[in-house]
Every structure is written in C-alpha cells, then in structure tokens.
Amino acid sequence: MKCMASDSMVSLGNGLSYPADKIRKVKKIIVGAGGDGGDCSRFLEWATRDFKEPPPKWKGSKEEESFLALVLKADGLYVYAPSFPEPEKVNAPFFAIGTGGEAARVAMMLGKTPEEAIELACQVDGYSGLPVQVLEL
C-alpha cells in the first residue's frame, strides 16, 4: 500500500494554531507540504493545476527553504523545495518532513505504520497535532 499521512496542526507566529489539511489527492498523485503555511497552501493549489503554470512566488528566498513538499506517484516518492528545479526522487522506503518528521522517520524505522508514526511524533513535537490524515494512492 502506498500512502501519505500527515498531522493536522498549522502554527502561526503569534502562538495560535488551527487544524488544516496538509495533504491532497490530485488525480493519480498525492501531494503534501510542511513549513510556511502560505507557501504550503500555494504549493497544494499549484499541484491541483497539475504544476502546469510557473511555480508560485514563494515567501522565502531560494537560499532559505520556507517549506518542503512531498509528491507520491506510482513510481515512488519525490521531495520538492523552492530551490529545486523539479521534485527529486527519494530513494528510501519512506520519508517524512516538517517539525515532527525526524520523530516520524524513527518510528517508521522501528516498524510503525505512517499513521502510528505521526501519532507518536505528535506526542513529542509541540508543532504537530492530531488528527492524523491518511490518503492512499
């Protein structure tokens, strides 16, 4: 089963947070993003237009990545950053981004499912929050 999972918490600079969708199924792919909320939203909207238009203008400069995105296709997982000319294939069985990404990767290394990994990451990362969202390819 190929899937993408995410937490639901978006945090603002003033200490406020709210639940939102961070992953989206678009035709035969799944996309997700973590980082600056505005740039994540712009990336997800760009994906719904099949990446046909030029990339949106990102908040951060190319030297400082304001967000990272994942693109799950039938042939594998790809990571995208504003400084990349195109998504780069991840040659690993799984990957995770965002503030809870390291915790989630460790959990998956220990055999947890993506959903379980995010639940655990939410317990140790103050910027990650439930519920977990899961989309299957």
Residue map of PLM features:
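N-terminal nucleophile
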Residues: M1-L137
